[in-house]
Amino acid sequence: VDMFLDNPNYEFIKGDIKDLDTCMKACEGVDYVLNQAAWGSVPRSIEMPLFYSLNNIQGTLNMLEAARQKGVKKFVYASSSSVYGDEPNLPKKEGVEGNLLSPYAVSKRCDEEWAKQYTRHYGLDTYGMRYFNVFGRRQDPDGAYASVIPKFIKQLLHGQKCRINGDGKQSRDFTYIENVIEANLKACLAPHEAAGQAFNIAYGGREYLIDIYYGLTKALGVDVEPEFGPDRAGDIKHSNADISKAKELLGYDPEWSFQRGIAAAIDWYKKNL
């Protein structure tokens, strides 16, 4: 946040979304809330279910209530593709969800249901962003729960061996951060008729993990074979998004392909790691 601290239109509030008073302060005099506050990681949620409930569910509920009381016009919040659970069909389409596979997924589904209630009963325009595997500059490459792309880039840059969970043939709809930013801004301008709903936010593509790995080794000029481990609990084999609803109702039109995004991400990490 350092780059914003000198901006007179920016205020940094250090606080916890589990504290309603902090949320009320954050929403004071605000027209638009873009709530990205949550704990990620499916595996960690399996280890810490109560922690995820308190932060991701109660925290979001606090923000919704603060937004309602302070007269916020639009409330845009982070959901997740994990809400599709074990639904096998591709592409993933809103309204066709399966059984949830992790406490993290439960927390995001609960957030969506609470948001719907605030639209239905209190007239707060809410818009859920079902993010699909977001990546890009400044994403943390460290720790046991780091996302795979920044983690692989850092390991390869440092000559370390990368570990792939499963056989590497799983696929995801990796979404560059610029597309996510666009989606949030579009939601702020969306009509009331689109409120109380959730939207797939992705590029609409499908990338295989093993192909990403070897693409990174080629781009970075290294020759390191990966090691393979067991599948992670709570993970699905394949995922990609139908983004037609977001296009129609929000005007979402992602410009950053996976290839363009991965090139930008590599360039940033090479300069900043």
Task: Describe each model-derived feature in a short phrase.
Residues V1-V134, C188, P254, A264:
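N-terminal Rossmann-like NAD(P)+-binding domain of SDR-like oxidoreductases, especially those catalyzing
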Residues G15-K18, L156-L273:
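C-terminal substrate-binding subdomain of Rossmann-fold SDR/epimerase-dehydratase oxidoreductases
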Residues R44-S45, D86-P88, R138, F174, ...:
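Short glycine-/acidic-enriched loop or helix-start segments at secondary-structure transitions
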Residues N56, G136, D173-Y176:
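Active-site helix-initiating loop/hinge in glycosyltransferases
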Residues N62, Q139-D140, Q170-R172:
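Heptad-repeat alpha-helical coiled-coil signaling segments
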Residues C110, W114, Y118, V148, ...:
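Hydrophobic alpha-helix immediately C-terminal to the catalytic Tyr-X-X-X-Lys motif of short-chain
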Residues A115-Y118, M129, G136, F152, ...:
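Generic structural signal for nonpolar/small residues that stabilize regular secondary structure
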Residues P141, S147-V148:
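Conserved catalytic loops of nucleotide-sugar-dependent glycosyltransferases that act on lipid-linked
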